[in-house]
């Protein structure tokens, strides 16, 4: 079975009520809420708690100052702020970007500090769409294998896999197959995107018009025959 979710940001407060209604009317199964760590009042999320709907969190990424693999990043301070929202809504999954850096020991220490078995680490593109010359960690098979040595819970993003494969000049579908087998995810990010770019893009799915989009659709259907996925 496939569960489908609706993506919102914590800054989309004007959409919260409508999103909850879509869950109640079974258009979607749950909400993935991206948390912008701007110190907002936790009571802003009361609508979700009162509605008692399933929810997952996408933890902040580097654009909002959270980089758990960078030793100079105040990840512990940001996490303490995030913990308030996590405790309030009790999300069933926490999606985490490894972001940019090379020190896996730092990531391991941060994961130990977070002490959260709900964390799902997402594969990354190689290049940043925001900062020139920034290289992400978690874009290659070798790096995912290194992460798997210290953490076993993943979210697979098809758009990021496509972008990474193009950056590496390797076959996109074969790369995705190997990565999915290695990560063994139950949680996926799907979107429409331009085919010939290294940049990570996420557009609304309007049509399944490319070979990789068809691959994505068929892959999810085949995995869902064996286990429940989101």
Show the residue positions of the predicted features.
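Alpha-helix-loop-beta-strand connector modules within alpha/beta enzyme cores
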Residues: 49-62, 113-118, 144-149, 212-226
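Hydrophobic faces of well-ordered beta-strands that scaffold small-molecule active sites
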Residues: 2-8, 29-33, 55-59, 92-96, ...
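N-terminal pre-domain/capping segments
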Residues: 1-81
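Active-site beta-loop-alpha junctions enriched in small/polar residues
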Residues: 7-11, 34-38, 58-62, 99-101, ...
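Non-catalytic positions within long, well-ordered alpha-helices that form the structural scaffold/packing
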Residues: 23-24, 86-87, 181
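Active-site acidic/histidine proton-transfer and metal-coordination neighborhood
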Residues: 65-153
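Short amphipathic alpha-helices and their capping/turn segments at secondary-structure boundaries
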Residues: 38-53, 106-112, 138-148, 170-186
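Gly/Pro-rich active-site loop or hairpin
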Residues: 65-74, 132-137, 162-228
């Amino acid at each position: 079975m496939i569960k489908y979710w609706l993506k919102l940001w914590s800054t989309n407060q004007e959409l919260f009520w409508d999103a909850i209604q879509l869950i109640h009317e079974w258009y979607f199964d749950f909400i993935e809420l991206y948390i912008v760590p701007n110190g907002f009042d936790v009571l802003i999320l009361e609508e979700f708690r009162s509605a008692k709907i399933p929810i997952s969190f996408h933890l902040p990424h580097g654009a909002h100052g959270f980089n758990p693999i960078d030793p100079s990043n105040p990840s512990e301070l940001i996490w303490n702020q995030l913990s308030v929202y996590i405790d309030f809504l009790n999300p069933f999954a926490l999606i985490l970007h490894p972001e940019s850096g090379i020190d896996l020991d730092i990531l391991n220490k941060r994961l130990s500090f977070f002490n959260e078995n709900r964390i799902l680490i997402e594969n990354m593109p190689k290049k940043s769409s925001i900062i020139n010359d920034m290289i992400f960690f978690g874009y290659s098979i070798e790096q995912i294998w290194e992460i798997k040595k210290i953490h076993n819970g993943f979210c697979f993003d098809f758009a990021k896999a496509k972008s990474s494969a193009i950056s590496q000049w390797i076959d996109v579908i074969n790369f995705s197959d190997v990565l999915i087998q290695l990560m063994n995810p139950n949680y996926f990010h799907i979107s429409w995107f331009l085919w010939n770019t290294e940049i990570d893009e996420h557009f609304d799915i309007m049509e399944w018009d490319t070979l990789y989009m068809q691959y994505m659709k068929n892959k999810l259907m085949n995995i869902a025959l064996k286990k429940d996925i989101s």
